[in-house]
Amino acid sequence: HLDHVPVIDEDQKRVDYMPILERAVKAGYQSVMVDGSRLSLAENIAVTKQVADFAHANDIACEAELGSVMGHEGAGANMDYEEIFRTKKGFTDLGEAKQFAEETKCDWLSVAVGSIHGAIAEGVRNQKKPEARLDIEHIADLSKVTGIPLVLHGGSGINNQCILDGIANGIAKINVGTEIRQTYERTLGETN
């Protein structure tokens, strides 16, 4: 699976994403993910439909992202998690998710439901992520309106019961990069 091919990168620059996806298909990837979450809904739908059509023409699956998964870096590091969770700021909108799934025909949808993306920036990369939780009712509602498997990005640091409840309500794939990367980097540092 080729994950997080952005349409707009972290520096807010457009990415020529199709050649990246084409190389992945030639290399034998069985699924790809296009991240148009920094685009307007209409643009994200158009880009994702293009990528889903391309993926399906090559007999592979397409994952997409809708909503804004909070980050543990940059501006996200200074945000009040409890306030974001309470107001659902950036959470995937139910109406938009229904429209997105229907119009794009993506196979999986990465949704914003309370998780926190990993610590990548230099200033926070060795810090433990704040403990997050998932809005299980929102996950169930998203699963119902989209009718497709949901994906959880930022799965590191969420307690096991929340993960199990998320799976029971529609989460089918979970990304857990922070715990793996931090363990790898710590071990690498110990061997040098």
Where would I find each of the regions flagged by the language model?
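Short catalytic/ligand-gating loop segments at beta-alpha or beta-beta junctions
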Residues: H153-S156
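Extended, intrinsically disordered, low-complexity segments
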Residues: T191-N192
